Amino acid sequence: SQRQDLLSDASADNDLLTGAGGEPIPAGPREAIETYRKILETYPNYERNDQVLYQMSRAYDEIGQPDEAMKVMDRLVAEYPYSKYIDEVHFRRGEYYFVRKKYFDAESAYGAIITMGSTSSYYELALYKLGWALYKQELYEDAPHRYMAMLEQRQSVGYDCGENPEESEEHRVTDTFRVVSLSFSNLGGPEVVDEYFDEHGHRSYADKIYGNLGEFYFSKLRYEDAASVYKSFINH
């Protein structure tokens, strides 16, 4: 049947997205996009059209057309909110907005994943990027909450913030402590850190928050502030 032919073409085109050596074949993604478009037009009620849209968006990314990929992802989000691809798609949308400095829109996309809960494999990464989206909007009071939530999530699955994680994770955790310290610095300094932990409870990684803030002040030659941070930590 025509439908089976189209689906066979789509399957074949999926295989063309990358060559045997992992290198993209220039004609492959474009051919795939046309096949996906035919499926969507001819069979609008096909039960796997969320997968068709997902593959179509990836194909647009393959040929360097992120704006077109975004249009397809927006359609997937609108028409298939419970698709198995939805959290990845929300994250990719968040990244699209973030690199274009549309931080409010990025906040919304990352937030959609957090609403889904910790069962999403993108949950922790979304917390991290949401913290950055808030920080970029100068929402310094909100950003630390998201970062702390990310650290809490890591600890809940047995991760020790004091241990040596894998390189990519180490960068994320180190960056988290750094931007939390920057947020507190923008809010006023050591007394703000004290108030935060007094209000929200002590954290096992509080020493790293104080330490990073102290190092930040020291690097800026703000020696009195640095000393004040270390004194606050000792007193807490």
Predicted regions and their residues:
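Acidic, polar-rich low-complexity tracts and alpha-helical solenoid repeat scaffolds
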Residues: 1-236
